[in-house]
Amino acid sequence: VFGGNTSFIPFAAQHRGQSVRGTLETYHERARKSVIDYSFHLIVSDPTEQVLAEELPEAFEGGITSFKVFLTYDKLIVSDEALLDILVTARKHGALTMTHAENNALIKWMVSRLVAGGYTAPKFHAVSHPGAAEAEAISRATRLANFVGAPLLIVHVSTDEGANIVAD
């Protein structure tokens, strides 16, 4: 490689029913012929006991230093209890947890009302994700991270209220 990007760190997404180990093996196989340096941010959506006790520590030992969890989207969302377990595991191994913080229930509530009213054009996506959904989830996630003494990176901050919570 001459100039340009010399490294790439995409997300490797674990979905429900998949192991972290298998997810990383699949992504490493896809990157096998890479001519640049690569690593992965891991998306964790199924933090089973095995994932927390064995597979995440193995991933950290294998060079994964950060991962992302979602507080919204039905196929990716983790519960508050799972988030606490993930934060503690990450803290123990010196890894960084990132989160997409939006209140899933509020978004689903808004979507159902918009769809029922016939408001389905793409411009209503933003309406279905009100600032209150972001602010509540950022507040909740940061309080949980502070409670267990774990670092947390909030991604996609798009509101003044959310930014103010992060700044505090």
Where do the PLM segments sit?
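Metal-associated gating/positioning segment near the N- to mid-region
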Residues: V1-K33
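Structured loop/turn residues at beta-strand edges in well-structured enzyme cores
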Residues: G3, I36, G62
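Structural detector of well-ordered beta-strand residues that form the stable sheet scaffold
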Residues: F8-I9, S39, M98, L153
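Acidic, glycine-rich active-site loops and adjacent beta-strand->loop/helix elements
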Residues: A12-G17, L42-T48, Y73
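Short acidic, glycine/proline-enriched helix-loop-strand junctions
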Residues: G22, I36-D37, H93-A95
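Aromatic side chains
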Residues: Y27, Y38-F40, F70, H125
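A glycine-rich helix N-cap at a beta->alpha junction
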Residues: E29-P47
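Histidine/acidic residue-rich metal-binding segments in metalloenzymes
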Residues: Q50-D168
